[in-house]
Amino acid sequence: MGAQEIIRSIEAEYTKSDLPTIYVGDTVKVGVRIQEGGKERVQPYEGVVIANSGGGINESITVRRIFQGVGVERVFLLHSPAVASVQVLRRGRVRRAKLYYLRDRVGKATRVKQRFDRSI
């Protein structure tokens, strides 16, 4: 057994199998586990996926949303234990792999057209 196979077998234990297929431009709701005091709760974070990177256990998405007039971006490792759930709310129609140009846009210009040919 080579080193790559050993790494894959260890990673297979930690990968989540219930994740939906996420594309750039999709609007998603990510449930993030937060520890406050001795309690744990799940906080939803909703926004547009502007970047998708990595593969396997290192797969991550960058989600952007506008909060109180300020753009906020968070990077989520999809297979992390801190990510409780990922739900696709709507599919977006875009022609780019990275939507970094949305950072320079304000108001209604940041909207992404909806895509109807992919199921949610």
UniProtKB/Swiss-Prot annotation:
Q: Which UniProt keywords apply?
A: Ribonucleoprotein, Ribosomal protein
TM region positions: none
Q: Name one GO cellular component term.
A: cytosolic large ribosomal subunit
Keyword Ribonucleoprotein listed? The answer is: yes
| Source organism, top-level taxon | Bacteria
Q: Which InterPro entries match?
A: Ribosomal_bL19, Ribosomal_bL19_CS, Ribosomal_bL19_sf, Translation_prot_SH3-like_sf
Q: Which GO terms describe its biological process?
A: translation
Instruction: Quote one Gene Ontology molecular function term.
Output: structural constituent of ribosome
Q: What is known about what this protein does?
A: This protein is located at the 30S-50S ribosomal subunit interface and may play a role in the structure and function of the aminoacyl-tRNA binding site.
Family, according to the entry, reads as follows: Belongs to the bacterial ribosomal protein bL19 family.
What protein is this chain from?
Large ribosomal subunit protein bL19
- Originating organism: Synechococcus elongatus (strain ATCC 33912 / PCC 7942 / FACHB-805)
Q: Which gene encodes it?
A: rplS
